[in-house]
């Protein structure tokens, strides 16, 4: 669905951003986090559906499961709050972002799903580390 159709979710995330509570957005959570950070979404001509979507960075490629019809507009050069972490190699859309200052990141796919439930395990381990660090230095 269209993440802009649920402004209350965006407002909730904006409130969480201000509290600096760690956030890991997945799929629509990625889109809502992006909107809360000032990025924009757009409707894909053909949605990303299925189990064979290559995403990655210069050093790492993963095959992911995806099911969405919207994506984030690539205007990261304007928005200095976040940086690009991953792209979708099929169409160059944004597949992952991270906040420059606070413990927030998100991905535009399902790391908990097939093709391999352990392929993206590093994301969950990263989130656990962020929680542990945040707890230690308590932003809360």
Regions found by a protein language model. Give the residues of each.
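Acyltransferase
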Residues: 112-140
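Secondary-structure boundary motif
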Residues: 18, 77-78, 133
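Catalytic beta-strand/loop cores that center a nucleophilic Ser/Cys/Thr
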Residues: 60-102, 140
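Short FAD-binding loop at a beta-strand-to-alpha-helix junction that anchors the flavin cofactor
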Residues: 103-109
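Active-site glycine-centered loops adjacent to acidic/histidine catalytic or metal-binding residues
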Residues: 27, 68, 110
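Cysteine-nucleophile active-site neighborhood
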Residues: 1-63, 71-74, 117-119, 123-126
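Acidic beta-to-alpha connecting loop that harbors the catalytic carboxylate
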Residues: 1, 111-112
């Amino acid at each position: 669905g269209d993440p802009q159709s649920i402004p209350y979710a965006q407002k909730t995330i904006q409130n969480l951003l201000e509290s600096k509570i760690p956030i890991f957005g997945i799929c629509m959570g990625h889109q809502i986090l992006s909107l809360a950070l000032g990025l924009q979404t757009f409707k894909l001509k053909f949605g990303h559906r299925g189990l064979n979507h290559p995403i990655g960075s210069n050093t790492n490629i993963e095959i992911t499961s995806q099911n969405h019809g919207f994506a984030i507009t690539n205007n990261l050069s304007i928005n200095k709050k976040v940086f690009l972490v991953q792209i979708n190699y099929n169409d160059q859309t944004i597949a992952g972002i991270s906040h420059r200052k606070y413990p927030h990141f998100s991905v535009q796919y399902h790391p908990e799903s097939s093709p391999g439930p352990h392929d993206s395990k590093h994301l969950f381990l990263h989130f656990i580390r962020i929680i542990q660090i945040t707890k230690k230095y308590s932003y809360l």
